[in-house]
Amino acid sequence: PQAEYVYWPGCSGAYDARNRKVSRALVALLRHAGVDFAVIGPEEKCCGDAARRMGNEFLYYQLATENIETLNAYGAKKIIVQCPHCAQALERDYPQLGGRFEVVRHAQLLERLVAEGRLPGAERAGAQAAFERVTYHDSCYLGRYADVYDEPRAVVKACGAQVVEMER
């Protein structure tokens, strides 16, 4: 696929029923915003993060090198990543094997598209939020490892909801 971005849904975004809904919703938002993206599809393998974390370096290496070869064959430069674990692998682990890509986390891209006016917030769309108050859970890999905290909250606020922080 020759596009500005490759969208990488990851294993959970491709196989888990609930996360497939997230993938479809993200694709709809990207299309609405006019983002030039492509999907690799069945050639995308698991990023290998889980295998590596469990100590199976051989399987990680096999998956990662196959993915890098596939991404390079398609000329991928920028990758929209839905799964924080995949983002971690693509951004921090793959360069050790020659995979150098600009990793864009979907929450950050959505926030930017709202800020640019390419995605309307609830106010501009004349819509009402599905929920008035929302508590957002920071996943470990998105928050602690990637330091992405503000963008997801900005997207929730743009949807017209108040973000209420959890007690720590």
Where are these regions (language model features)?
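Iron-sulfur cluster-binding electron-transfer modules in prokaryotic oxidoreductases
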Residues: 1-168
